[in-house]
Amino acid sequence: MQLERAAFSDPFSFLGPQYQSKGIALRVWMPGAVSMVVEIENGEKFPLTREDESGFVLISKMDLTAAVYKLHISWPTGEQTIHDPYQFHGFMPSGDALVSPSKMHSEMGAQLISLNKGGQPISGVRFLTYAPNASAVSVIGEFNAWDGRRHPMQRLDDGLWGLFIPDLEDGTQYKFELKDSSGNSLPHKADPWGYSSEQYPSFTSIVYDQSRYQWQDKAWQTRPVSVKHQEALSFYELHAGSWRRNEQGDFLTYRELAEQLIPYLSEMGYTHLELMPVSEHPFYGSWGYQPIGLFSPTSRFGTPDDFKYFVDQCHLAGIGVVLDWVPAHFPSDDHGLANFDGTALFNDPDPRRGWHQDWKSYIYDYGRDHVRRFLISNALFWLEHYHIDGLRVDAVASMLYLDYSREHDQWIPNHDGGNQNYDAISLLRWMNEEVYSHYPNAMTIAEESTAFSGVSRPTDMGGLGFGFKWNMGWMHDSLSYIQEEPVHRKFHHNTITFPLIYAFSENYVLSLSHDEVVYGKGSLLDKMPGDEWQKSANLRTYMGYMYGQPGKKLNFMGAEIAQSAEWSHDGQLEWHWLEYPRHNGMKKLVSDLNHLYQDLPALHELDCSPEGFEWRVQDDAETSVLAHERFALNGDKVLVVSNFTPVPREGYTLGVPAEGEYEVLLNTDAEKYWGSGTPIQQTVKTQLLEKHGLAQSISLDLPPLSTVFLAFKQHA
């Protein structure tokens, strides 16, 4: 019997009240029950007759199709009263649940709803999933002893399966039990749209009420739409499990992070927190980049309400929250999307397109409609339900190119014979259009490591539509330069200046991310040449240079305290080093740089425009000195001068365009930053002496290994 094998796809045709020639037949399938009684609305009770080992029936003249009834069930271990799920026929959404990405996340999965039948409201959970190639799907959980025979789902249109189970509440654990097209049992699956989840070993999904949390960030959410390109954006990239641990070495919870991290971010002057992926992921060592529960914040650090509280508190402190989002691939764990209905439902079955060789994970099939809507719905979900301010899209290059990290015989060209993945390109454009149309104050950021054109260009101009792109070229070239011994830097001068050739081809974020301090690469401090003092001085110079360059800023946690060891997800940052001036000085410097960057429009308003930057000294390779000016929309300007050698440059002369004076705002060599404290003029007047093709010039005493910021004041 199909019910006995949990292989029935049309339970409403047999279970619940059914019309027949002798009246209404009420059938209930309840494996393990001893006896059963039905109670109708007026309180009358009627025993059901056992038809076979697990089935019960009542033949009645009463119309049970319109009224609500209860079942009183006797089990070997006790009594139970429930509303029969199979009396609620016709309460399922249509295939429209899969059509609109902005609505999908509120329709699919486990939704707490209240139905009205016969004038009586009945609360419970409506389960809805997508498995077009399955022959049967059941909901299993604690409520039915994880028995797939008890709650078979109804096959609906368009590949959907649904069932309303009354009386279930927030916090109910569940999974889906599926059979493939041949009737073979599949591994129990977590809900692809599940709002909450449990970690190893159960990997269960958990019913969660999205409306329960009471947000306090209305002022933040309703602030006027701003031009992000002209804002000071300074991101602190963070891995929640290894920023700080408690005294026992355990993770901080979301609420503990709110208490400890947010004041730190405010002190340090960061405008935004960028969280490495918080979507549920079974393998902690993946850092979140192998997600399975795309709609569920990881339970390692608390509940969904706890994560909402964390975001809420960030907003109340004036700090935006950006999430790393991973649409490039998904892991092969049995309880996830892999082989969900017995087929490659979410990935291309051909491994040349559907399997990532480096990461040993599946690649989404971006050409399939349900996959596209699933991913876009997920992007919108985080902005809607968790008030997230932006998405940093991971591994975009791997999506754009069919031959990404493949040999010539390991990929399939597109229909034009090329290597671009047109479906992925289309998906990213659609995602950006949806995000910016629904949430105009949000931002999307691409981690894209190639020269693909127009990543941050609007879609109506042929671009991908991202707000920003990480400048991987700047990161690579600048780190390559700063790792050279100072005496050799003159031979690599073009390496540090080259990124300015393309600095305005995209809306760039200058990123010093986690990727640069793992896998044997060492910490930023460890990359620097020289003795202990020179390492710190080089890093201070480099940080100053970064904050003076055009582009938004991103630092991975630990850079701001000159972490000496490379990052490990199994521990915490080296906070103990802050007892020493070398590290505490770096912390003070990064804080001052962030606040300077925010306070001076010249350092951020035209980050993405060539009108905001001019070289003053570009080609002095012999001394390894660079100088440029940054401009605000109102014409205010800041001069940034970097000396990349440990040799003080007394009376260094550089040309400037106008008469006036320059006032020192910040000097990375200052003693409070653990610098040498080499004397430097605090105010420098221009002189009528031509230099670098300009009529005016100034003479500066440049400290060794330093970056100096100076504000210009024009003479009346």
Swiss-Prot record:
Pathway(s) it belongs to: Glycan biosynthesis; glycogen biosynthesis
Main EC class the enzyme belongs to: transferase
GO molecular function: 1,4-alpha-glucan branching enzyme activity; cation binding; hydrolase activity, hydrolyzing O-glycosyl compounds
Documented EC number(s): 2.4.1.18
Single GO BP term: glycogen biosynthetic process
Active site (catalytic residues): D394, E447
Keywords: Carbohydrate metabolism, Glycogen biosynthesis, Glycogen metabolism, Glycosyltransferase, Transferase
Annotated SUPFAM superfamilies: (Trans)glycosidases (SSF51445), E set domains (SSF81296), Glycosyl hydrolase domain (SSF51011)
CDD domains hit by this protein: AmyAc_Glg_BE, E_set_GBE_prok_N
Matching SMART domains: Aamy
Family indicated by similarity: Belongs to the glycosyl hydrolase 13 family. GlgB subfamily.
Protein name: 1,4-alpha-glucan branching enzyme GlgB
Source species: Photobacterium profundum (strain SS9)
